[in-house]
Design a protein with these regions (language model features):
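Conserved phosphotransfer microenvironments
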Residues: 14, 35-39, 46-72, 79-82
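CheY-like receiver
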Residues: 114-137
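Two-component/phosphorelay signaling modules centered on CheY-like receiver
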Residues: 11-30
């Protein structure tokens, strides 16, 4: 199951973004203010997207990214200056002030990419070597 987790130090900002996502039909798994809470929500889903700000109450976005499994992607919402030097792998960025249209399109694109990778993983699992086929029979 793909989960979307919204993490911002200001609970009101996180709730507003969650309401925006729910309004367009996206399923939001959780809203939180700390990276530890986000990791707790991440344990409850197979894969997902973390929508977060640059600095959380207990850690920076880069620390949270390091702690998350590879099945998770991150959408960083921050001013351009915060991520000018580049972003880590698995992190996409949107500049503040954010437009609802840009947020929705970016999340849809990330969800499509995750779906494509999931299908690709399933195909590789189904293809077996002749030795594996012989063991099964």
């Amino acid at each position: 199951m793909v989960g979307i987790i919204v993490v911002f130090p200001n609970k009101d900002n996180a709730t507003n973004i969650r309401n925006l996502l729910v309004r367009v039909g996206l399923n939001v798994t959780g809203v939180c203010t700390t990276g530890a809470q986000a990791m707790n929500y991440a344990d409850s889903v197979d894969e997902g997207i973390i929508v977060c700000g640059y600095k959380l109450k207990d850690m920076m976005y880069s620390e949270l990214r390091e702690y998350l499994p590879d099945r998770f992607e991150m959408l960083l919402i921050a001013s351009q200056g915060k991520w000018e030097e580049g972003l880590a792998s698995g992190v996409m960025g949107l500049t503040m002030p954010i437009k609802a249209y840009d947020l929705m399109n970016t999340l849809q694109m990330m969800l499509q990419n995750m779906d494509r990778r999931r299908r690709k993983r399933k195909k590789t699992i189904k293809s077996r070597t002749p030795e594996q086929e012989a063991l099964i029979r």
